[in-house]
């Protein structure tokens, strides 16, 4: 049987560079080597593309020591990786690309745009849905237009805030009650997110969030449980049972997710049946509204007192580490890790096949 050549992208110019490496390593270790020839492609924090030549089990933060310069050709007649060694370029054919790039410059439609130009099938959401889901402000606005329940929010731009700080502080305090969450609009893994309990906290939180983006979100804090759903599919969508995060800290921060490792995942979430069904229905609706394909994780809040469900965000390239919710939810729902990878790759090929039927010329 001819093996599919699957290029796995990891690293990237992102605050989630290290997490991406862990996710990609986990995916590559769980790929069926009888079906796939794995081609690991790393992107450094400076944006350099490199073909990783070391062993998958040895992949860590020092991966660049075992690498050769490369890049994906945007020429769709090639559908290949270009390897550059000793000033000579050679083409390596690629059947599918599996982007495992969390956050900016990977999960936001930028790499997806390059892969669209190349014509190579790729796992996950397309350019538009990736960009919208990455930008929490646009995602919130679209959800609002579609009548999806969510908490009160305000979008603040850095240049406007710098010119009228006092105005925005007063506006926030008039529209919200403490505590509030302050988030960079384009960030993942809770990087740059703070919970503000008073004005002093708020000023510091805004400063912190603006370190990671020029646009931030102010959100009303809700006394809520953090619930997540894994969604899989293109035209036909499968929604997993919901899972719950019990944060080891006050909220599911970057540290709680990846450093102290003591947050608890409860699968399935212990919810009333009608709340579970509402969450699954909303997850499927949101997936379709945002025109997602391949995969996404849809996150919600559930009020601890009333069980009211609120939309939080969509992650188009969810974590695939050993402690990540997405593969755990899918496994609980009957799709083991290796089968999940198979399905994602087949969905990528299916999506690419559909695009090939589109006419780009009036001729013929």
UniProtKB/Swiss-Prot annotation:
SUPFAM superfamilies: Glutathione synthetase ATP-binding domain-like (SSF56059), PreATP-grasp domain (SSF52440)
GO molecular function: ATP binding; D-alanine-D-alanine ligase activity; metal ion binding
Entry-linked InterPro entries: ATP-grasp, ATP_grasp_subdomain_1, D-Ala_lig_Van_CS, D_ala_D_ala, Dala_Dala_lig_C, Dala_Dala_lig_N, PreATP-grasp_dom_sf
A biological process from GO: peptidoglycan biosynthetic process
Pathway: Cell wall biogenesis; peptidoglycan biosynthesis
SS bond list: none
Gene Ontology cellular component annotations, sorted alphabetically: cytosol
Organism annotation: Caldicellulosiruptor bescii (strain ATCC BAA-1888 / DSM 6725 / KCTC 15123 / Z-1320) (Anaerocellum thermophilum)
Ligand binding (Mg(2+) 1): 299, 313
Predominant localisation class: cytoplasm
Cofactor binding, per record: Binds 2 magnesium or manganese ions per subunit.
Annotated catalysed reactions: 2 D-alanine + ATP = D-alanyl-D-alanine + ADP + phosphate + H(+)
UniProt domain ATP-grasp: residue ranges: 140-346
Family assignment from sequence similarity: Belongs to the D-alanine--D-alanine ligase family.
Residues that, per the record, bind ATP: 173-228
UniProt-recorded name of the protein: D-alanine--D-alanine ligase
Cofactor(s) listed: Mg(2+); Mn(2+)
Group of enzyme by EC: ligase
Protein function: Cell wall formation.
HAMAP family per record: Dala_Dala_lig (MF_00047)
Gene field: ddl
Location in the cell: Cytoplasm
EC number(s) stated in the UniProt entry for this protein: 6.3.2.4
Keywords noted in UniProt: ATP-binding, Cell shape, Cell wall biogenesis/degradation, Cytoplasm, Ligase, Magnesium, Manganese, Metal-binding, Nucleotide-binding, Peptidoglycan synthesis
């Amino acid at each position: 049987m001819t093996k599919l050549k699957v290029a796995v992208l990891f690293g990237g110019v992102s605050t989630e560079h290290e997490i991406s490496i862990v996710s990609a390593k986990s995916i590559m270790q769980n790929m069926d080597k009888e079906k796939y020839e794995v081609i690991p492609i790393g992107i450094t924090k400076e944006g350099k593309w490199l073909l990783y030549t070391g062993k998958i089990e040895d992949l860590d933060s020092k991966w660049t020591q075992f690498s050769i310069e490369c890049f994906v050709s945007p020429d769709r007649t090639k559908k290949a990786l270009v390897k550059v060694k000793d000033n000579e370029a050679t083409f390596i054919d690629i059947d599918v690309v599996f982007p495992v790039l969390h956050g900016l410059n990977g999960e936001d439609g930028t790499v997806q745009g390059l892969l669209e130009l190349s014509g190579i099938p790729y796992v996950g959401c397309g350019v538009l849905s990736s960009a919208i889901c990455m930008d929490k402000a646009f995602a919130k606005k679209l959800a609002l237009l579609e009548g999806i329940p969510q908490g009160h929010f305000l979008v603040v731009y850095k240049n406007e805030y710098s010119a009228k700080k006092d105005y925005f502080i007063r506006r926030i305090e008039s529209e919200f009650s403490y505590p509030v969450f302050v988030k960079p609009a384009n960030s993942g893994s809770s990087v740059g997110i703070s919970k503000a309990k008073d004005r002093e906290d708020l000023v510091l939180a805004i400063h912190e969030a603006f370190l990671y983006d020029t646009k931030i979100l102010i959100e009303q804090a809700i006394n809520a449980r953090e619930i997540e759903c894994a969604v899989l599919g293109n035209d036909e969508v499968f929604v997993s049972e919901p899972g719950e995060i019990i944060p080891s800290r006050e909220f599911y921060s970057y540290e709680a997710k990846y450093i102290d490792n003591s947050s608890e995942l409860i699968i399935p979430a212990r919810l009333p049946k009608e709340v579970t069904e509402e969450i699954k229905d909303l997850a499927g609706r949101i997936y379709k509204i945002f025109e997602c394909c391949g995969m996404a994780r849809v996150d919600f809040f559930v009020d601890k007192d009333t069980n009211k469900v609120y939309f939080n965000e969509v992650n188009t390239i969810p974590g695939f580490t050993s402690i990540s919710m997405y593969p755990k939810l899918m496994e609980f729902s009957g799709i083991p890790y290796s089968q999940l990878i198979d399905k994602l790759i087949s969905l990528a090929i299916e999506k690419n096949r559909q695009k090939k039927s589109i006419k780009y010329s009036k001729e013929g």
